[in-house]
Each structure stands twice: as C-alpha cells, then as structure tokens.
C-alpha cells in the first residue's frame, strides 16, 4: 500500500520540528507548488486508508515474529456480551467499555503470574458488529498457556474453535471463543481500526471509538536476534494463509534501530534506497495508467476503500 494523502515537508533542517503544508480537495491531496516556501520532501499522513492498511499489515508482521519467538500458547480470543451485561449510552446504543477489557487482561495475567508464568503479551481491539453495532472485543494473546481448552462446533469453513473455563472465570459478562493465532487473525484484529467510522460519527452516536491496545515490544525479541539478516534483505518472510510472503520491515524496528544502532549512516542508506524504489514504482504505475499524480491517488483511494468494505472475519482460527 502507499499513502494517498502525503504531506509536504518544507524548510526542514536536521533536528528541527517538521512543518507541513497540506491542501486537500475532497479525499485527494492537491499541492500548491507556487507558494513561497521550499518543498523538500513528502511524508505519509498516517490517517488515510492506505496508511491504515499499511499499519495493520505491520501489526500482522510483528505478531507473526512474536509467534516465532514463542511458538506455543498463542491464541485469538473473541469476547462478546450477553444481553444482561450490555452497557448502553445516553442514546440507547450498546457501547464498548475499555475498562472491561483492561480489567480482564490484567486479571488473567496476574492469575498466571501467581502460578509462575510471566511474559504474556497481547494485541487487542474493540469493535462494533456490522449489522446491529453490537460491541465485542478481539484479543491476540501470546504465550498464554491455556490447558483447559474444550472443543466447540467447527466454524463454517471447517476450522476448530475452543472455549476455556479459565477465560470464562475472568470474562463473566458474556461468551467467548478461542482460535489458533495466525498472521491472518492478527492482521484482522489490527484492521478493525481501518474499518472505523469517522470521529464525527462516533461523537454523534456517543460511542467509544474502535482502538488498538497492545503490550510493549511485540515481535522485538525475534527482530533483535535476527536484525542483521532482516536488514540485509530489508524484508521479513512471514507464513500466511496464502503461503510464504515477503513484507516490509515494520517502522517500529527502524525507530528502535535509530536509537541503538551505532552505524546510523547504514540505516539512512537503507531508507534512501527504499524511497528510490517507492518513487520509481509510483512513476511506473503512473506511466502505465497514463493519469496525473492526483488522479492516480484518487483511483488508488477508491480501490482501497473497496478492500476495506470487503474485510471479513477470519474463520481460519485453528485447523481440526
């Protein structure tokens, strides 16, 4: 993916705060290059659908690397409310309650810590159902040793799901399902922030916005143990439901290495190389499409919006 509304950086010197000029016409950015400031470069806006899809893919990669560090006890957990435990806002709409999921995760981790098991991590999101806007939560748990799994009915595509008395003990507000954690389910959890309503919509409906919550350092252990090879190839190989795929190095790892790597010029070289490749790819796509840069971004926005509309729940949550 690529940013569909890149921001122009101008008059930027090393160490100075970044200033932006952003002129928009609808959903597509248009830049007035005749202004009396010097435009040096462009940076991602981090808000458009392209940036949000890139961000969700990065979380999928980081989750997959965390699984590689701890191959056992990784689960995709869905928590739902029973009718009597739904919390309604002033407009009579069922609402997510962040304190509920925070308390659940803290209680679960303390339970295992008292039994000598530490190092449980998570990636969680709150979400509203597509049809009835019913609140529920998805949590990717890493290194969570559930030993009381009970098999439930198979999903409609033939993959196994479970329940756990341990999960029920700490989530007493409704129901839950457990599946095997994969790149697909982690990416799906992160993509809920891509499907979100606009800020004004949440305020108008008085709903808690959909948001990601996570532990620190997801995927960091594997990265630190393999960083030389990863940067040599400048990519990460991940097993997905469509086979082995090559992904970009998550920006989180770049920021980490900027603080820790002594050879900062090497990292600058890698970033410059990436930028040249990205610009060349963009130029080639424009040539093929025979459209202006602005029109090209508009077309890409429409394509990505259609992708977001088709996002579905990952039924591949554990093979039989």
Curated annotation (Swiss-Prot):
Q: Which reaction does it catalyse?
A: ATP + (deoxyribonucleotide)n-3'-hydroxyl + 5'-phospho-(deoxyribonucleotide)m = (deoxyribonucleotide)n+m + AMP + diphosphate
The residues annotated as the active site are: 188, 192
Q: What is its EC number?
A: 3.1.21.-, 6.5.1.1
User: Which GO terms label this protein's molecular function in UniProt?
Assistant: ATP binding; DNA ligase (ATP) activity; endonuclease activity
Q: Indicate whether Transmembrane appears among the record's keywords.
A: no
Pfam families (alphabetical): REP_ORF2-G2P
Extract the InterPro entries matched here. ORF2/G2P_dom (IPR056906)
Q: Which domain of life is it from?
A: Viruses
Keywords, in A-Z order: ATP-binding, Endonuclease, Hydrolase, Ligase, Nuclease, Nucleotide-binding
User: What's this chain's function?
Assistant: Plays an essential role in viral DNA replication. Binds the origin of replication and cleaves the dsDNA replicative form I (RFI) and becomes covalently bound to it via phosphotyrosine bond, generating the dsDNA replicative form II (RFII). In turn, viral DNA replication initiates at the 3'-OH of the cleavage site. After one round of rolling circle synthesis, protein ORF2 is linked to the newly synthesized ssDNA and joins the ends of the displaced strand to generate a circular single-stranded molecule ready to be packed into a virion.
Q: Which family does it belong to?
A: Belongs to the microviridae Rep protein family.
Name the record gives this protein? Replication-associated protein ORF2
